[in-house]
Amino acid sequence: MIALIQRVTRASVTVEGEVTGEIGAGLLVLLGVEKDDDEQKANRLCERVLGYRIFSDADGKMNLNVQQAGGSVLVVSQFTLAADTERGMRPSFSKGASPDRAEALYDYFVERCRQQEMNTQTGRFAADMQVSLVNDGPVTFWLQV
């Protein structure tokens, strides 16, 4: 399971002209689900995403996680993160989970975030989405479990 996380000052996702999720300061989480992923990996990745210390403390050091910084989370499904790009000029998606399994794990991940008392907004699974963000820093990390 893969999360591309970006520290943002604001972010939103729009589906068919309707804003489905919007946050102020916090994390934009692009979530990719691979074939061998399961609930255990989703738990671990959620723990890492919410615990990752990439927000500045009073001394300007990256020492606070999103909860400590008072931020929110916007989770957007992103199957292209599971692409195999090692060969050729066209990505292969053979490493990705089936759509049904990916959606179940995406929903599970979102619910785990919410159980941690995080303001968690979402896109719409498998929809054509437009994501807008202001990357703060820029600060972007690839987390994989």
Swiss-Prot record:
Gene3D superfamilies, alphabetized: D-tyrosyl-tRNA(Tyr) deacylase
Domain of life of the organism encoding this protein: Bacteria
Keyword field: Cytoplasm, Hydrolase, RNA-binding, tRNA-binding
Class of enzymatic activity (EC top level): hydrolase
One Gene Ontology term from the biological process aspect of the record: D-amino acid catabolic process
Coiled coil: none
Principal localisation: cytoplasm
EC identifiers of the protein: 3.1.1.96
tRNA-binding is among the record's keywords: yes
CC annotations in GO: cytoplasm
Catalytic reaction annotation: glycyl-tRNA(Ala) + H2O = tRNA(Ala) + glycine + H(+); a D-aminoacyl-tRNA + H2O = a tRNA + a D-alpha-amino acid + H(+)
CDD domains: Dtyr_deacylase
Protein localization: Cytoplasm
Molecular functions per Gene Ontology: D-tyrosyl-tRNA(Tyr) deacylase activity; Gly-tRNA(Ala) deacylase activity; Ser(Gly)-tRNA(Ala) hydrolase activity; tRNA binding
Motif (Gly-cisPro motif, important for rejection of L-amino acids): 137-138
Family in the record: Belongs to the DTD family.
Quaternary structure, from the entry: Homodimer.
Notes concerning its domains: A Gly-cisPro motif from one monomer fits into the active site of the other monomer to allow specific chiral rejection of L-amino acids.
Designated name of the protein: D-aminoacyl-tRNA deacylase
Organism expressing this protein natively: Escherichia coli O81 (strain ED1a)
